[in-house]
């Protein structure tokens, strides 16, 4: 029973979602030549770091989680694990994860993990989430760290490919998160969390969602234009972006914003999973003839 509680507090669903993006970044950089020990070290290392961040987040948010219908039954809210024990648990998970990334992958992968962790726990969870409408924007940077870590674990350098991945996954986070805030509007309102839909209104949030999806679409194409991914990836990226944008635009005419937001959120998961899979299998070796290479 205790094992289940210690697992729940790490938010396994979030860990799994991040692993898909880590695999995408890792295999994109590997270009068909997979170092399996490095692959395992990277996956486990990122999983432990993400788990640590989630436990710290649960500790920090236990007061506001009590006010939200979705989170009122979380382990720390119900007192199934003491706050002090959760802090020790989170710290041990983080140390293990960072050590695996440093010694099993490379220092760059570890430092990227540290930066993502600091942004998520230190900046987003401790301050921005509660005090600023821009909390989601800052938090998106930490959400984009896992695929970049996977990529840089292979390359050992932060190049244009890593920058494109950072842009893709950061931009994806915004409409994804705003959709959650819309269909969980009352929860965020009750907990006094200043997300955009609550502070500025759902109509303003819809405008932001549309603009971020357009920016996301452009960013996804950069992997092919830069010579990092092939035409199969390009077709899938274009298709999911157009479909997602179409869903966003239909939001201006719907009667039930919550139903629409749930559908938009659901497709966001499909979209990022499809991109992660396609960049894993349809990679290319960038050359001097790629469009971005001539600019970069």
From Swiss-Prot:
Instruction: Using the UniProt record, name the top-level EC class of this enzyme in a single word.
Output: transferase
The membrane topology term of the UniProt record is: Multi-pass membrane protein
Q: Which GO terms describe its molecular function?
A: protoheme IX farnesyltransferase activity
- Keyword Membrane applies: yes
The listed locations are: Cell inner membrane
Residues that span the membrane, as ranges: 9-29, 36-56, 84-104, 108-128, 133-153, 163-183, 209-229, 234-254, 265-285
Q: Which domain of life is it from?
A: Bacteria
Main subcellular localisation: membrane
Q: Which reaction does it catalyse?
A: heme b + (2E,6E)-farnesyl diphosphate + H2O = Fe(II)-heme o + diphosphate
Give the GO biological process terms: heme O biosynthetic process
Its annotated pathway reads: Porphyrin-containing compound metabolism; heme O biosynthesis; heme O from protoheme: step 1/1
* Record-linked CDD domains: PT_UbiA_Cox10
Q: Which UniProt keywords apply?
A: Cell inner membrane, Cell membrane, Heme biosynthesis, Membrane, Transferase, Transmembrane, Transmembrane helix
Additional observations: Carbon 2 of the heme B porphyrin ring is defined according to the Fischer nomenclature.
Q: Which family does it belong to?
A: Belongs to the UbiA prenyltransferase family. Protoheme IX farnesyltransferase subfamily.
**What is the documented function of this protein?**
Converts heme B (protoheme IX) to heme O by substitution of the vinyl group on carbon 2 of heme B porphyrin ring with a hydroxyethyl farnesyl side group.
- Family matches, as HAMAP family: CyoE_CtaB
Q: What is this protein called?
A: Protoheme IX farnesyltransferase
Q: Which organism does this record belong to?
A: Citrobacter koseri (strain ATCC BAA-895 / CDC 4225-83 / SGSC4696)
Q: Tell me the gene name.
A: cyoE
């Amino acid at each position: 029973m205790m094992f289940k509680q210690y697992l729940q507090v790490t938010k396994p669903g979030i860990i799994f979602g991040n692993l898909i993006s880590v695999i995408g970044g890792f295999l994109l950089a590997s270009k068909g030549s997979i170092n399996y020990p490095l692959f395992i070290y990277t996956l486990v290392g990122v999983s432990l770091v993400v788990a640590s961040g989630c436990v710290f987040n649960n500790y920090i948010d236990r007061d506001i989680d009590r006010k939200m219908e979705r989170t009122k039954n979380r382990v720390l809210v119900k007192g199934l694990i003491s706050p002090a024990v959760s802090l020790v648990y989170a710290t041990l998970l983080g140390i293990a994860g960072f050590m695996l990334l440093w010694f099993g992958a490379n220092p760059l992968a570890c430092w990227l993990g540290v930066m993502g962790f600091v942004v998520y726990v230190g900046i987003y969870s401790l301050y921005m989430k509660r005090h600023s409408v821009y909390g989601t924007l800052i938090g998106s940077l930490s959400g984009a760290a896992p695929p970049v870590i996977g990529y840089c674990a292979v390359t050992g350098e932060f190049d244009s490919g890593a920058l494109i991945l950072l842009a893709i996954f950061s931009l994806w986070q915004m409409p994804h998160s705003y959709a959650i805030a819309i269909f969980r509007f009352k929860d965020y309102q009750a907990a006094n969390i200043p997300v955009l839909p609550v502070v500025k209104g759902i109509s303003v949030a819809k405008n932001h969602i549309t603009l971020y999806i357009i920016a996301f679409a452009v960013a996804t194409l950069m992997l092919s234009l830069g010579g990092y991914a092939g035409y199969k990836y390009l077709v899938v990226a274009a298709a999911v972006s157009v479909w997602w944008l179409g869903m966003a635009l239909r939001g201006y005419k719907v009667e039930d914003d919550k139903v629409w937001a749930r559908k938009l959120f659901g497709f966001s998961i499909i979209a990022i999973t499809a991109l992660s899979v396609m960049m894993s299998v349809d990679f290319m070796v960038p050359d001097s003839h790629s469009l971005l290479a001539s600019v970069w």
